Amino acid sequence: MAPPKTASELPVRSFASSADWEAWLAAQPLTSTGVWLKLAKSASGIASVSKQEAIDGALCHGWIDGLVHKFDADYWLVRVTPRRPKGKWSQINRARALVLIKLGRMQQAGMKEIERAKLDGRWKAAYASQSKSKVPDDLQRALDRNPSARRNFDRLDRINRYAILYRVHDAKRPETRAQRIKRYVTMLSRGETIHPASRSRNPQRLVK
């Protein structure tokens, strides 16, 4: 099975070990645009770099993992690319990067990305994953003042809930954050969501 058409220009590679994977990363030129990395499924019995090893290697060399797709009966594909100049950091990757530094594994390219993120504020502004995200106090207060919005927020699926929390967190200025909170509370009070429900499902309708 071929990789997704949207990124079919990237090479598809597999590596038997984390050492092979990191050696490949270290040899990549600055002009590299990324790779579709093949990760063998556990039941395949094929020697392969694991997903965590793939992520660790990417972080150490200033790269980042992304989309995951099915490849065939034995492999998954994960898209791994150099981190973009203003690419956001997740709290999970930030914490893992600190572990890799303590272990002495972080490479120069990876440290440069960390230093850049610290200088421009992206390191401090790292976002929580969907499973770890919490409702901030200012959003909670706004919801509490609007019972209809609060009720509909509590009924959101995890995708729509995280969509709001992420966008509020991602606001760069206090006034932008306040505007977003106001907009989402108004949206919720009308029973609307950021991501409409799939037509293939019949979810419970949000009510005012």
Where are these regions (language model features)?
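Charge-dense, helix-prone N-terminal extensions
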Residues: M1-K208
